[in-house]
């Protein structure tokens, strides 16, 4: 009995090195006797191994994704905080909203740093991290711009931020489907589509411009929550004579920061559209 490795993980020269005499292979307890013809050996062996690893994804040697490590736990905690941030902003509970937003911003830096420094980078992390960023940006932008809320962000800037993230989300869903179909033929189903741990198909590669854009968006949205909190606290005290002057200065700086953020958002969206290696197909 001879135990062989999957055909798709071997060199292309394997086709010419398959012996010209009968040999055997064991898959799931089934002994298969190969033909003498090398080409038939290659085709039969390829089909059997692909079928074996498609029906038993846990055996696939390329799965390197692990969900529960420290960086991914930080990312998941950021996702869990996101709906509460939006709720607190809408209900004018600005102190906990600012605290959770600051926590989310810090963990966004920490998870990537820990993953790179300690070799904990995973396929799941490359997908969950930008997903957490998009959820945080979309939720906070909506909460700060809807008419029923404080509406401190202009509609034009909110439309730019939301439009880019929605388009990226749609493209990510399409890329996930197409790469899953290529990597796991016949295994594209609802459960496998959302199971990025057992069925990883692509790795997200954000550009440096995208990282800077995320930074500016976090500073801009965090400043919006801070401005609302400042107006609320100072408005209640009404002890400072120059309150209105400081408020106008703060609002002016916030407006300029909004223009910068809108510019980087547009540039980042264009770079994603033109960049060919924003997503890497896993082999």
From Swiss-Prot:
GO terms for molecular function: cardiolipin synthase (CMP-forming). Optimum temperature is 45 degrees Celsius. Its cofactor is Mg(2+). The chain crosses the membrane at residues 83-103, 155-175, 209-229. Its main location: mitochondrion. It is found in: Mitochondrion inner membrane. GO terms for biological process: cardiolipin biosynthetic process; intracellular monoatomic ion homeostasis; lipid biosynthetic process; mitochondrial genome maintenance; mitochondrial membrane organization; phospholipid metabolic process; protein targeting to membrane. It is an enzyme of class 2 (transferase). It is a multi-pass membrane protein. Pfam families: CDP-OH_P_transf. Optimum pH is 9. Disruption phenotype: Cardiolipin absent from cells. Decreases cell population growth during growth on the non-fermentable carbon source ethanol. Sensitive to thermal stress. One of its GO terms (cellular component) is mitochondrial inner membrane. It catalyses: a CDP-1,2-diacyl-sn-glycerol + a 1,2-diacyl-sn-glycero-3-phospho-(1'-sn-glycerol) = a cardiolipin + CMP + H(+). Keywords: Lipid biosynthesis, Lipid metabolism, Membrane, Mitochondrion, Mitochondrion inner membrane, Phospholipid biosynthesis, Phospholipid metabolism, Transferase, Transmembrane, Transmembrane helix. InterPro entries: CDP-alcohol_PTase-I, CDP-OH_P_trans, CDP-OH_PTrfase_TM_dom, CDP_ALCOHOL_P_TRANSF_CS. Its EC number is 2.7.8.41. May be found in a large complex. Catalyzes the synthesis of cardiolipin (CL) (diphosphatidylglycerol) by specifically transferring a phosphatidyl group from CDP-diacylglycerol to phosphatidylglycerol (PG). CL is a key phospholipid in mitochondrial membranes and plays important roles in maintaining the functional integrity and dynamics of mitochondria under both optimal and stress conditions. Belongs to the CDP-alcohol phosphatidyltransferase class-I family. Present with 876 molecules/cell in log phase SD medium. This is Cardiolipin synthase (CMP-forming). The lineage of its organism: Eukaryota, Fungi, Dikarya, Ascomycota, Saccharomycotina.
């Amino acid at each position: 009995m001879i135990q062989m490795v999957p055909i798709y993980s071997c060199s292309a020269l394997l086709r010419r090195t398959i012996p010209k005499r009968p040999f055997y292979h064991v898959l799931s307890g089934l002994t298969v006797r190969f033909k003498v013809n090398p080409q038939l050996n290659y085709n039969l062996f390829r089909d059997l191994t692909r079928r074996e690893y498609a029906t038993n994804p846990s055996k696939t040697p390329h799965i390197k994704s692990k969900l529960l490590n420290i960086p991914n736990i930080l990312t998941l905690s950021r996702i869990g905080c996101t709906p509460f941030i939006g709720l607190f902003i809408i209900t004018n509970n600005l102190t906990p909203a600012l605290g959770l937003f600051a926590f989310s911003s810090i963990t966004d830096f920490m998870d990537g740093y820990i993953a790179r420094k300690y070799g904990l980078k995973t396929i799941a992390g490359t997908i969950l991290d930008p997903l957490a960023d998009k959820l945080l940006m979309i939720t906070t932008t909506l909460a700060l711009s809807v008419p029923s809320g404080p509406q401190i962000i202009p509609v034009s800037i909110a439309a730019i931020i939301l439009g880019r993230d929605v388009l990226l989300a749609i493209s990510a869903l399409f890329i996930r489907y197409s790469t899953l179909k290529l990597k796991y033929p016949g295994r594209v189903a609802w459960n496998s589509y959302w199971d990025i741990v057992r069925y990883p198909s692509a790795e997200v590669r954000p550009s440096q411009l995208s990282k800077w854009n995320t930074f500016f968006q976090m500073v801009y949205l965090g400043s919006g929550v801070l401005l609302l909190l400042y107006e609320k606290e100072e408005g209640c005290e009404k002890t400072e004579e120059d309150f209105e002057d400081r408020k106008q200065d703060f609002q002016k700086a916030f407006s300029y920061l909004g223009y910068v953020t809108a510019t980087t958002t547009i540039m980042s969206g264009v770079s994603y559209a033109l960049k060919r290696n924003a997503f890497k197909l896993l082999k």
